[in-house]
Amino acid sequence: MQNYKFLKDINFPSDLRKLSENDLQEVSNEVRKEMIDAVSETGGHLGAGLGVVELTVALHYVFDTPNDRLIWDVGHQTYPHKILTGRKSKIKTLRQGNGLSGFTKRSESEYDPFGAAHSSTSISSALGMAEANKLSNKLNNIIAVIGDGAISAGMAYEAMNNAGASKTKMIVILNDNDMSIAKPVGAMRTYLAKLLTGKIYFSLRETFKLIVSAFSKRFSVKAGKAEDFLRSAVTGGTLFNSLGFYYVGPIDGHDLSTLIPILKNARDSKHQGPIMIHIKTQKGKGYSYAEKASDHYHGVSKFNVVTGEQVKSGTNLPAYTKVFANTLVKHAERDSKVVGVTAAMPGGTGMDIFAKDFPKRMFDVGIAEQHAVTFAAGLATEGYKPYVAIYSTFLQRAYDQVVHDVAIQSLPVRFIIDRAGLVGADGSTHAGSFDITYLSTLPNFIVMAPSDEAELVKMTNTSMTINNKPCAIRYPRGNGIGVELPSIDENIEIGKGRVIQEGKQVCILSIGTRLEECKIAAAELKNKGIESTIVDARFAKPLDQELILKCAREHEAMITVEEGSIGGFGSHVENLLSEKGIFDKGLKFRTMILPDIFIEQDSPKKMYDVAGLNASQISKKILDILFTKESIKVVKN
């Protein structure tokens, strides 16, 4: 840590509160420097945290955290919060194995009263805490901080609707930086822009600051006529007022001389109901490279602080995301019915590539996964070919729509599921562990998992031909293995796997990108005199029953390997073998799946070590099946 004037002596917010208000801007500057220094070494979310440094300092200065509950939506903006709440010495372990989480986490600190990583949960959880306090006759404050992107999601509207009718005091800080990950979209964004650019805001901005300063003592003591005047003068009627919120703003979120008295006023207010404080901030504030390109500095790899240059991956292998996007563009050039849908993640899913060539056929619906799925279903009813590109972890948020609006109606929506399996530094909140399970259980679904980038191209090609039911293609974060890519005319037969190599004793059924580990495991077994058949199953649904049953009858043992949880591919294979009476004939069988735990952040390789799904663990499992007395074996009568 640098030799800071103030930060060196701040370990907890109680230390911060000992300082004069006049010192807080320098504290903010030091926190900002420390954050930039840390993220330059660890990588992580940079821009969002830089934009809320002053807000973070002000909140911990004004409120009695952790007794007062401070809830951050999403949590990727909480690095300054972590620096000020007892985690300063560990800040350079962010997103590392056994290090600090990149998000808020209840088990990490009492200053994190609610864990986060997915968006739009803060107002709901804050309202729950506020109602609990009312029932318990507690007087502590509950504060939720939510961004302009996250507040556009349906869950946030549901929470505001409930909060406005509750007459329960809570404080919501709307952090408006005009940039969630990609630029926010939709009517809410337009509405907030009008609030920020209207004549009232600009003409009264300085006047507002002066009045707050003049009445600062009165503001800190009680709400009065000055507060009522400011509220009516600055806001007039707003959507938030209509929802039952006492709305103040918009105000400059980097101006501590304005923030602190307004937060004190909200803290001390006797208003019975929710209070909304709308602040305007700049994502990437204080670091010129992040200010100029805030979308590219949302999440960063390690970087040079002086030049802003990020460390490149050092590989020329194509990313799965880009392989899919480029393949879809080629199909869209041929077929005008191809359309893209994403939920506020065009860059992460590769749909920004599609949008450059087909802007009118690309729909970014914002942080609205439920809407995205049903919107795509509507497109499908009119003969279009919607591709919903979404992270596995975020598709979970729209499961009812997948079932009710897509699967039951057998609509040909194509789900392109990125970040399947274990994802590394973002940890358990972003892992794609469950999609094979929750999609393969649905009637009318086709579920595919490519073993490499060439297979991804073939599956994307094949999805173009599926016009009577939904399908899904799931693939991991990261790069392929360097195989040659096929043309867009090369399809695969639905429900048919492929044999990679043939042996006599054991059959390894792999689905997805664990195939390379299975090959290494088979080589290890060969050195021990054990011959293995390897099958790339390709499809979790429908299963290649003919191939699976043939392999089961011709081998002493069979093992399935997948990057998914219980109830997925292996469970469906086991059910097939049971129904066909294969176990009655003595087959030794095991499934290798993700364990029944949430695996914490680390490198993907280390996470798969924890999961028991790397090559040496696969070969050991097979040896156990073949040679231990405890192996599962159903003997003939």
UniProtKB/Swiss-Prot annotation:
Residues reported in the UniProt entry to bind Mg(2+): D148, N177
Disulfide bonds: none
Listed EC numbers: 2.2.1.7
Catalytic activity: D-glyceraldehyde 3-phosphate + pyruvate + H(+) = 1-deoxy-D-xylulose 5-phosphate + CO2
SMART domains according to UniProt: Transket_pyr (SM00861)
This protein's UniProt keywords: Isoprene biosynthesis, Magnesium, Metal-binding, Thiamine biosynthesis, Thiamine pyrophosphate, Transferase
Chain residues that bind thiamine diphosphate: H76, A117, H118, S119, G149, A150, N177, Y287, E369
Biological process, per Gene Ontology: 1-deoxy-D-xylulose 5-phosphate biosynthetic process; glyceraldehyde-3-phosphate metabolic process; terpenoid biosynthetic process; thiamine biosynthetic process
PROSITE patterns linked to this entry: TRANSKETOLASE_1 (PS00801)
Alphabetical list of InterPro entries matching this protein: Dxylulose-5-P_synthase (IPR005477), THDP-binding (IPR029061), Transketo_C/PFOR_II (IPR009014), Transketolase-like_Pyr-bd (IPR005475), Transketolase_C (IPR033248), Transketolase_CS (IPR049557)
SUPFAM superfamilies listed in its UniProt record: Thiamin diphosphate-binding fold (THDP-binding) (SSF52518), TK C-terminal domain-like (SSF52922)
Organism superkingdom: Bacteria
Cofactor(s) recorded in Swiss-Prot or TrEMBL: Mg(2+); thiamine diphosphate
Pathway info: Metabolic intermediate biosynthesis; 1-deoxy-D-xylulose 5-phosphate biosynthesis; 1-deoxy-D-xylulose 5-phosphate from D-glyceraldehyde 3-phosphate and pyruvate: step 1/1
GO molecular function, one term: 1-deoxy-D-xylulose-5-phosphate synthase activity
CDD domains: TPP_DXS (cd02007), TPP_PYR_DXS_TK_like (cd07033)
Pfam families with a match to the protein in the record: DXP_synthase_N, Transket_pyr, Transketolase_C
Task performed by this protein: Catalyzes the acyloin condensation reaction between C atoms 2 and 3 of pyruvate and glyceraldehyde 3-phosphate to yield 1-deoxy-D-xylulose-5-phosphate (DXP).
Protein name (Swiss-Prot/TrEMBL): 1-deoxy-D-xylulose-5-phosphate synthase
Organism for this UniProt entry: Pelagibacter ubique (strain HTCC1062)
Lineage: Bacteria, Pseudomonadati, Pseudomonadota, Alphaproteobacteria, Candidatus Pelagibacterales
Gene symbol of the encoding locus: dxs
